[in-house]
Amino acid sequence: SINFPYTVGYGMTECGPIISYEDWVNFKAGSCGKSAPRMETKILSVDPQNVPGEIVTRGDNVMLGYYKNEEATAGVIDEEGWLHTGDLGVMDAEGNITIKGRSKNMLLGPSGQNIYPEEIEDKLNNMLYVNESIVIQALDGKLVALIYPDFDLAFANGLTEDDIVKQMEANRVALNQEVAAYEQIARVKIYHEEFEKTPKKSIKRFLYQEAR
């Protein structure tokens, strides 16, 4: 409503760091733009517009390799020069790239559906008093949301611990109305400390699998 100009790009250190972007006038909401100049990007999928696949890219921005580590380099750059990002996404007919999540984070639904926890987390993180979250798959196959609430804001607004628990449950119910049946969150678990992160501020998901 305030017409604030912004855009979203996509990149990684190995690509110096830009892979794609679009100016704010032509930016397609939800995407991260089109391939940057002198870069080529494609989706490894039988149907790149509809079925997510790994995002691969090549061009002037791509690194020559990891310093003195040929094995690691060969693990991400193939013989044709394509750098395998490890990210999953789709690309529309105009070349706009939409990221779905990391390939290593993808979960399988009860009927083999691909579930991208980052997409669910993005919705949950925008809900009332949610600071950050992780969606994991329990041993029974159901999805569980681990939530670190914004305790400071909640307490400042007069909420109690019980109120916060009720609000997180209300968020779960509201979220389930926005996602597909196979993406439904069965229950939530509240954490009282911020999730541990890497130096790049990515949550160390592997530390929280025991919550299943």
Spans of model-derived segments:
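C-terminal boundary motif of the adenylate-forming
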Residues: 88, 126-151, 176
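Conserved C-terminal helical docking segment of ANL/AMP-forming enzymes
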Residues: 114, 127-132, 153-190
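A structural signal for short hydrophobic beta-strand segments in well-ordered beta-sheet cores
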Residues: 41-43, 87-91, 135
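Residue-level signal for inorganic ion chemistry
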Residues: 41, 95, 124, 145, ...
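Generic structural signal for well-ordered beta-strand positions
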Residues: 51, 92, 98, 115, ...
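Conserved C-terminal "lid"/linker of ANL adenylate-forming enzymes
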Residues: 107, 132-134, 141, 172-212
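Gly/Ser/Thr-rich phosphate-binding loop
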Residues: 1-27, 131
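Conserved ATP-binding/catalytic segment of the ANL
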Residues: 35, 47-50, 54-109, 126
